[in-house]
From Swiss-Prot:
GO terms for cellular component: cytoplasm. Its EC number is 2.4.2.10. GO terms for molecular function: orotate phosphoribosyltransferase activity. The gene is URA5. GO terms for biological process: 'de novo' pyrimidine nucleobase biosynthetic process; 'de novo' UMP biosynthetic process; pyrimidine nucleotide biosynthetic process; pyrimidine ribonucleoside biosynthetic process. Catalyzes the transfer of a ribosyl phosphate group from 5-phosphoribose 1-diphosphate to orotate, leading to the formation of orotidine monophosphate (OMP). This is Orotate phosphoribosyltransferase.
Amino acid sequence: MQAYKKDFLDLATKYEALKFGSFTLKSGRTSPYFFNLGLFNTGVALSTVGASFAQVIINSGVEFDVIFGPAYKGIPLAAVTAAKIAELGGEKYATKEYAFNRKEAKDHGEGGNIVGASLKGKKVLIIDDVITAGTAIKEAFSIIDANGATVSAVVIALDRQETTVDSPKSAVQVVSQTYNVPVLNIFNLNDVIQYTDGILTEDEKKKIEQYRDQYSPKE
């Protein structure tokens, strides 16, 4: 496992952003684990999140001009990742921009629904915590398109690697295939299973493996 993944997962368990047990999801499924990126709520935690996102982006080699964080959860992610990628990525990434959207457009002052860098004519990387139903990501694509830009990739913290309630594909697969862009992640369910070696009991780990086998995409 890459060092940035282990650092991220270590912190996720410390802050209880990644928990194990029995959790009812919005989909109605009962999951043996739960992830809430919002619990990375200190400066050092947020710095680790930004560094992890930055490392994923650098490793991928994806070309982009602007990091876009959909309101609201994506806003701090875009800002801290822009800062950390400038720190870790050298000159190539030193002037990458970031932006986010307002939930309601302003009709005074600077106006519009975008805060930060202009998107027009640029390659945009969308950053968010997870993709579940994909609704928030679809909205982000629409906003970016309406502002005259194109999406080069999506990067998320967690890929749950499970089917949606109405498709044999995962939400990540649906987004990637619908928009023809790569969807990158800091970690996925297989990483969680690997990470929990020696942390969870065999019974607890088996429940996660059974959940993966039941809901993993079959194509």
